[in-house]
Amino acid sequence: MNSKIFAVLLLLALLSCVLSDQYCPKSSITACKKMNIRNDCCKDDDCTGGSWCCATPCGNFCKYPTDRPGGRRAAGGKSCKTGYVY
């Protein structure tokens, strides 16, 4: 009996992990002029309200995660600066 309960709980835990995958949304923009590239964030801590720092061709922006893959999170790092990137 205990092993059946354990198996059900384990299955529920695995399903919740699989179903909770979150991604940065895919950008609809494929290119951006260099003078328009701007970073609003460099890491997730720069964003508020549960949004993530996501990379786009026009810079890094805070976006709410989605369940569809395609976008990418900003790499951040010491060289990342907020504001316009020239």
UniProtKB/Swiss-Prot annotation:
Protein's recorded name: U15-lycotoxin-Ls1e
Location of this chain's protein in the cell: Secreted
Keywords recorded for this protein, A-Z: Antibiotic, Antimicrobial, Disulfide bond, Secreted, Signal, Toxin
One Gene Ontology term of the molecular function aspect: toxin activity
UniProt PTM comment: Contains 5 disulfide bonds.
Species name: Lycosa singoriensis
UniProt record similarity statement: Belongs to the venom protein 11 family. 01 (wap-1) subfamily.
Known role: Has antibacterial activity.
Domain of life: Eukaryota
Signal peptide as annotated in the record: 1-20
BP GO terms, sorted: defense response to bacterium
A GO CC term assigned to this protein in UniProt: extracellular region
Disulfide bond annotation, renumbered to this chain: 24-54, 32-58, 41-53, 42-80, 47-62
Tissues/organs with expression: Expressed by the venom gland.
